[in-house]
A protein has these predicted regions:
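A general "terminal functional-core" signal
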Residues: 1-145
Length: 145
């Protein structure tokens, strides 16, 4: 995403990732937040809470495109972070709520997830989509306004 949007002042990219994860040379986002290996739910979510609202308020996007990767999961082979299933769900619900309470539409894509058991990775992706749909349901259909 960062490589595709590099140099575009009308697009803001925020990336939270382990500082030593793959790939070693990363395209630069507008805001890159490199976390220590093994960062767990609470530290990850407080970092997100410290940055996302400010980014949304100051940049003022028309739409939020959310890459809902599951590579921050503790059992991921490449992500190097330590989020639990609940932590991923809390992250996804939080991102949706921050966008929607500002009246912003949000679209999401699956991304990341490199476990040894494909079924478990797929389940994490499915839980991510369900968490976002459940949070989004609290805000109703903006197209009807």
């Amino acid at each position: 995403t960062a490589a595709l949007t590099a140099g575009r002042e009308d697009i803001f990219t925020l990336s939270m990732h382990a500082e030593k994860n793959f790939p070693v040379r990363k395209a630069r986002s507008t805001l890159d937040i490199a976390l220590p290996d093994g960062t767990g739910d609470d530290a990850y979510l407080s970092t997100l809470e410290a940055h996302l609202p400010r980014v949304l308020d100051e940049f003022g996007p028309d739409v939020v495109l959310y890459q809902a990767g599951v590579d921050p999961h503790a059992n991921d082979k490449l992500g190097r972070l330590a989020l639990s299933d609940e932590g991923l769900q809390r992250r996804d619900s939080y991102v949706v709520s921050e966008a929607r309470r500002r009246g912003l539409p949000i679209a999401s894509a699956l991304g990341g997830g490199y476990g040894t058991e494909p079924r478990l990775v797929a389940e994490r992706h499915a839980r991510s989509m369900i968490a976002m749909a459940q949070e989004n349901a609290h805000y109703g259909d903006a197209s009807q306004k």
